[in-house]
Amino acid sequence: MLRTRGPGSILDPPLGGRREAIERELKKLRAEREELDGRIRLLESQLEAGPAGFNGAAAGKGVGDDACGGSGACQSRVGNGFAPDGSLPADMIYRYSRHLLLPDFGVEGQRKLSQSSILVVGAGGLGSPLALYLAACGVGCLGIVDGDDVELNNLHRQIIHKEAYVGQSKVKSAADACREINSAIKVVEHHHTLKPCNALEIARKYDIVVDATDNLPTRYMISDCCVLLNKPLVSGAALGLEGQLTVYHHNGSPCYRCLFPTPPPVAACQRCSDSGVLGVVPGVIGCLQALEAIKVATGVGEPLCGRMLLFDALSARIRVVKLRGSSPDCTHCGENSVFTEEDFQKFDYESFTQSPMSDKAAASVNVLPESARITCREYKKLADDGEPHLLLDVRPAHHFQIASISPSHNIPLSMLEEKLPALEASLKEAGEGSALVVLCRRGNDSQRAVQLLREKGFANAKDIIGGLQAWGQDVDPDFPVY
């Protein structure tokens, strides 16, 4: 009899699914009620403030891709809330008073910020604090582009979203949150994944682009797009317990291709969905991205041009290292570059980097013949029929502790070759002629393990197609998914 251990292994009562749906609907309705209450309070405060409070009362309603019109002209209010003589109305003075009190920022800094337009690419772990702070600080027009929906496993780090928005568009969720914090700005929703076919059209409407994505081909694409449009690019990254931040293509700083003309090996490109990330780490980097975008927009301070900030969460250490300058030989921003907008739209970034343009899991590999693989259902039948076998789980030990199929033996793939004698002994204990079935999270590492095992003489080794992910989909829907 197969058993699973780990959170979620106990079956819900028959009405559990219905109860969960009702609770989710209640959360959604309560969130909508809170939003309406907030808008009512805002309108009431504007009425109490008199004529000054009416300035921009209906701002922030732009939602379509056409709401931001033309070459950096995305503006939230007539004159961005400033009087003809350049003075601020009472409501803006009160809202941004702590900015205005800063000698290095003051009225001029707020004016420049309110006249700027910034595009945030990605409404995830980096984009969440980034968008919230840009909205709260009063950027004139905030564009948000993302093609994904909110998932429950986003919420530990993507703090702009709420449980009530699970299953809904990330852009809508993020835009609603930004409008709740500041209804006086314009928020433009781009419900797409940014691609070569739409990136130029979207990005050319904004003054500054901020890369808050999590994959290599998109980084190259956004950098190339900003070079073609001559836009500054604030780029951040966070993975595991580390993060980094810099400003590309601004004040003589290099573009991404200047530093990395050749993509790194696929094995070196990790993703949050594979390697994990502590929730606060993208929060730290996202806040710093907002700071850099504000510095670029206002001309206040020294942006991280030609420098890269490195953050180590475990040691609480921040270092800033110098980068080499823009390369005159760069194929995209160099003096003799012939890269055009037409070239950009035809460029295959996934083939160039050998990576998918998605923040989700990497694509499945297929390196074994069909005879060396079995499905989850075939394995379940084998186990239920009591056929002698050994189930080998080759995930890292900390993955095995999250959830596993019992009984199974855990030998991480990285240690498999040195543990072969112990594996051989365990296989003998399982009985003569026992099958060796190999399992991992998604069915990729298990194939690599079977390749190694067959080379070392374990001729009957087979892997389970799709791994534990397929097990949860096809055999046990209550098995914990991570």
From Swiss-Prot:
Reactions performed catalytically: [molybdopterin-synthase sulfur-carrier protein]-C-terminal Gly-Gly + ATP + H(+) = [molybdopterin-synthase sulfur-carrier protein]-C-terminal Gly-Gly-AMP + diphosphate; [molybdopterin-synthase sulfur-carrier protein]-C-terminal Gly-Gly-AMP + S-sulfanyl-L-cysteinyl-[cysteine desulfurase] + AH2 = [molybdopterin-synthase sulfur-carrier protein]-C-terminal-Gly-aminoethanethioate + L-cysteinyl-[cysteine desulfurase] + A + AMP + 2 H(+)
GO molecular function (one): nucleotidyltransferase activity
A UniProt-annotated Pfam family: Rhodanese
Record-annotated active site: 272, 440
Cofactor annotation remark: Binds 1 zinc ion per subunit.
Keywords recorded for this protein, A-Z: ATP-binding, Cytoplasm, Metal-binding, Molybdenum cofactor biosynthesis, Multifunctional enzyme, Nucleotide-binding, Transferase, tRNA processing, Zinc
Chain residues that bind ATP: 125, 146, 153-157, 170, 214-215
Predominant cellular place of this UniProt entry's protein: cytoplasm
NCBIfam families with a match to the protein in the record: PRK05690.1
Protein's recorded name: Adenylyltransferase and sulfurtransferase MOCS3-2
Gene: MOCS3-2
